[in-house]
Structures are given as structure tokens and as C-alpha cells.
Regions:
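Structural motif
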Residues: 54-69, 130-139, 184-190, 235-243, ...
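Repeated scaffold domains used in trafficking and secretory/extracellular systems
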Residues: 89-114, 159-169, 211-220, 269-276, ...
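Short coil/turn segments that connect the beta-strands within blades of beta-propeller domains
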Residues: 43, 118-119, 172-173, 224-225, ...
Length: 325
């Protein structure tokens, strides 16, 4: 090889090596940026459904199989589903029972899907049986994105016909719930020790009494810690209510309930209660409610100040939903 050609070859090789190094550095930088972006916890929208269940279940100490789905948080479109098999409770203590002469058959219903502070989920399930009502909690363990499951029975309810109608995580070991009577008024606030499933008898939170003829449901919490729910009276229009556990009435010493605004859609009052409420991490309130036909569930945004609902997805095929990271 002549000196000129050798010099040209060396220059080309050096240029090629430089290009390779630059490309490698760029790839590593891009990968690092992606890793950094991926390191940020991305919010996930979860949904829960209750498929048809077998009457062979031991409903006192087992949960029915459920279907946990993930959806696009912006559109509500379901992207994946996980079948959760029957779970046996890890605290199979006996609860109050009441034999009923008139009984139409066993049934199950999901009353909430709520996220814990660590990103895991809790699913309360109420079963109606000839011996009364049984309330159980399904937990995801480790991570809701790649979950394992366990279950607990709710213990120490006062009567066999009391039912957990909504649920909210207050702290690592404490759950706030709305308790009804066979799913109907009167409703009361109670707290559950999530470590053992027991109703906490002491009212350390000074929780308020609830009007005995009104329906209360759909507990949720905004990023600032304010608690929201719906209250429905004889008119059938759900009203958005809120409370802060630190704000108490001077006279009673109980937590104050603020009645904010009736829910409405397209300028008309929302007739019948919504099926669920939850906040995203950005502070946007969402609702699950029946669509115009009443045959499908739809996902809506909710303006907290006006109660105005805006359609996000007209076919959100879940019974309850929650946001988690």
C-alpha cells in the first residue's frame, strides 16, 4: 500500500472509530434518559370486575374470583387483564350470623377499589348468604403492577347484616369505611385495622354521624388529604361532599362535613348515584357512572366546584376503578 493510500485508510478508520464512539455515547445517553424517565413512577388506572361465581364457595372464608384490569389513564381504554383466583382469608375467625327464612340465593358484589400509600390495592367484597352477610378484603401484595394476592375477613361488625359499602386508606394500617345495613341506610363511618381485619371500636378520629335516611358512598381522597364522597337524599341526585379530619365542629367536636354541589351532566342533574369516584395524582376527580342508555358504564371527569361531569370513555367496562403508581 502506497504512503498516500495508507494515510487515507488511517483517516477513514479513525473517522469510523470516532463515529462509533459518538454513536455509542449517544445510545448510552438515550438509554440513560429513558431509564431516568422510566424511573419515574407512572400512574396506572386499574379496574375491577366480578365474573360469574360458583355457589360452591365458602363465602365466609373465601373470596370469589375477580378480574383486575389496567387501562390507559387518559382514555380509559382497557389494555390488560389479570384473573385473580379464589382467595382464602388468613384470619378465619367466626363472625356473627343470622339465619334467614326468606332467601333468594347467594350473591357477591364489589363495593370499592382503593389504592394504599405504597401503591398496592384493596378490594372489599360483600357476600349475601343464607347465614347473613360476609365482608372480605382482597389485597395486592408487593406491587399492583405485578401482584400477588391475599385476603382478610372483616371482623367485629356489630350485626350479621352490616356491609362495607366503601373504603379508603387513611394510613398504612388504617382503613376508613362506610358501613350500611344490607347495603341500605342507615350508614355509619367505621375504621378497620388492616393488619387483622378488625373494626376499631374506639373513635379516635371523631367521625361524624350521618343522616339516617340518606345514602353515602364512593369514598375517595385528593392529593391534599381531603376526603370526598357522595350523599344521596330522597330526590335521588347525588351531592358531592367533603371533609378534612383535622377540621372539627366547635359544638360537637366531630369532623365537619361540607356539602359542595350536586353532580350534573350536560346541564342536567345526575339522576341516581355514580358507581365510583377517585382522584388521579394530578388532583383531577373522576367518576364511573351509567351511560345514557343505562346499559354500560362510562368514565367521566368531575369538576369539584361545579359538579359538572365530562365524558372520557363511554364504554369503561369495569365495576370499580382506582389510580395508583
Amino acid at each position: 500500500m502506497s504512503p498516500l493510500k495508507r494515510r487515507q485508510f488511517t483517516q477513514l478508520a479513525a473517522a469510523g472509530l470516532t463515529s462509533t464512539i459518538v454513536a455509542d455515547i449517544s445510545s448510552k445517553a438515550l438509554a440513560q434518559n429513558n431509564d431516568q424517565n422510566n424511573g419515574k413512577s407512572e400512574e396506572v388506572l386499574y379496574g375491577i370486575n366480578l365474573p360469574s361465581t360458583s355457589n360452591a364457595l365458602n363465602r365466609e372464608d373465601q373470596t370469589p374470583p375477580v378480574e383486575l384490569s389496567t387501562a390507559d389513564a387518559k382514555t380509559g381504554k382497557v389494555v390488560s387483564k389479570t384473573n385473580v383466583p379464589v382467595q382464602s382469608v388468613d384470619n378465619p375467625s367466626s363472625v356473627r350470623k343470622k339465619s334467614r327464612a326468606f332467601f333468594t340465593g347467594d350473591s357477591d358484589r364489589i363495593t370499592k377499589l382503593t389504592a394504599l400509600g405504597d401503591g398496592n390495592l384493596v378490594i372489599p367484597i360483600v357476600s349475601n348468604t343464607r347465614d347473613g352477610y360476609f365482608n372480605r378484603l382482597i389485597y395486592t401484595v408487593g406491587s399492583a403492577k405485578n401482584p400477588q394476592f391475599r385476603a382478610k375477613k372483616v371482623l367485629d361488625l356489630e350485626t350479621a347484616d352490616q356491609t362495607i359499602e366503601s373504603l379508603l386508606s387513611l394510613s398504612k394500617d388504617q382503613l376508613l369505611c362506610i358501613v350500611g345495613t344490607e347495603g341500605l341506610p342507615p350508614f355509619t363511618f367505621k375504621t378497620i385495622d388492616s393488619r387483622n381485619g378488625k373494626i376499631i371500636s374506639e373513635d379516635d378520629l371523631d367521625l361524624p354521624s350521618l343522616p339516617p335516611a340518606h345514602r353515602f358512598a364512593n369514598l375517595c381522597q385528593d392529593p391534599k388529604g381531603n376526603i370526598f364522597a357522595t350523599e344521596t337524599g330522597s330526590e335521588g341526585v347525588p351531592i358531592l361532599i367533603s371533609m378534612n379530619l383535622q377540621e372539627k365542629a366547635i359544638v360537637t367536636g366531630k369532623v365537619k362535613i361540607q356539602r359542595l354541589t350536586p353532580l350534573n351532566f350536560e346541564g342536567r342533574p345526575q339522576i341516581n348515584d355514580v358507581k365510583d369516584l377517585n382522584f388521579s395524582s394530578s388532583g383531577q376527580l373522576y367518576a364511573l357512572a351509567a351511560d345514557k342508555s343505562g346499559k354500560k358504564n362510562a368514565l367521566f371527569t368531575v369538576d369539584v366546584r361545579s359538579g359538572k361531569m365530562g365524558l372520557v370513555n363511554e364504554d369503561f367496562a369495569v365495576e370499580k376503578f382506582a389510580f395508583s403508581v
